[in-house]
Structures are given as structure tokens and as C-alpha cells.
Amino acid sequence: MAIVRAHLKIYGRVQGVGFRWSMQREARKLGVNGWVRNLPDGSVEAVLEGDEERVEALIGWAHQGPPLARVTRVEVKWEQPKGEKGFRIVG
């Protein structure tokens, strides 16, 4: 079971639609650690850390997001795991 860390930037209609709260719920359901926050440019940034398969599943979810979101692009950058604990909304 490989532990991985993915740094995401999510673009589209992703603020004001419950994206962060929904991502937190999905992450906790999957057992993925990390954080999510809104950025001033209207995008959402997230760091996901955990079992590779579960992180991949949450990245897949991020391409869709919650029902009111309209995701146009997701950028993923793979990084070294840093030992995130829990999943939180920051900023």
C-alpha cells in the first residue's frame, strides 16, 4: 500500500457551491488526509495524502465535484508525503 501526496488546483465554478465541504466529506469517507481551500482567483486548492488508490478516487471525484459545481480543469502535481493528519478546510 503506497502512500502518496497529490497537490490539486481545481478550476471552474468551484466556489460558493459547497465544493470544500463536499470534498472534506468525501475525503473522510475514503480515509484520505489533507486540506482544501478557496483561492483569490476563484479556484480551489487541495492537498490529498493517503493510499494511492483512495487518493486517485478522490481526484476522480474532484473532476466532477458536488452537484452545483462545474469543474473545467484539474491540475495534479505529485509530491513527497508529509504525514498529513485528518482532512480540514483551511483559509
UniProtKB/Swiss-Prot annotation:
Optimum temperature is 98 degrees Celsius. Poorly active at 25 degrees Celsius. Thermostable up to 100 degrees Celsius. InterPro entries: Acylphosphatase (IPR020456), Acylphosphatase-like_dom (IPR001792), Acylphosphatase-like_dom_sf (IPR036046), Acylphosphatase_CS (IPR017968). The keyword Hydrolase applies. It catalyses: an acyl phosphate + H2O = a carboxylate + phosphate + H(+). One of its GO terms (molecular function) is hydrolase activity. The keyword Hydrolase applies. The active site is at residues 20, 38. Coiled coil: none annotated. Keywords: Hydrolase. Disulfide bonds: none annotated. Its EC number is 3.6.1.7. Residues 5-91 form the Acylphosphatase-like domain. Optimum pH is 5.3 at 25 degrees Celsius. Belongs to the acylphosphatase family. Monomer. This is Acylphosphatase.
